């Protein structure tokens, strides 16, 4: 989220305070004054050690809608997700686990996790992304 494509690029990170709440936080990354990424963090607790890793209901998902500047056509979603909000194992980013015991910390593709998800921007510049409770999504945009 915080990286820039080359040393001479100008990177600006913005917290979207007006859109954020107690349970969601939103950030944008602009590279050379162009929107490059949107970060969505869901802060709800789910399946935590406080309730012995048992939540009585399926993991809720929130849909977030965005309207992009002209020229943005598509994007890809990379997700940070685990079985619960305070999990120490089973954590993946964009479908890969970086657990040391799998390949000494190198990314290993997990068969049961989505990778390289695409979003389509409609003709009005809008798109939606679903974010499960206690997870994060980075939408990298083609603008």
Where are these regions (language model features)?
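Short Pro-Gly-centered flexible turn/kink motifs
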Residues: 130-141
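Acidic, Ser/Thr/Pro-rich beta/coil linker or hinge segments at domain junctions
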Residues: 53-131
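Catalytic cores of secreted or luminal carbohydrate-active enzymes
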Residues: 1-22
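Carbohydrate-binding surface patches
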Residues: 20-71, 79-84, 137
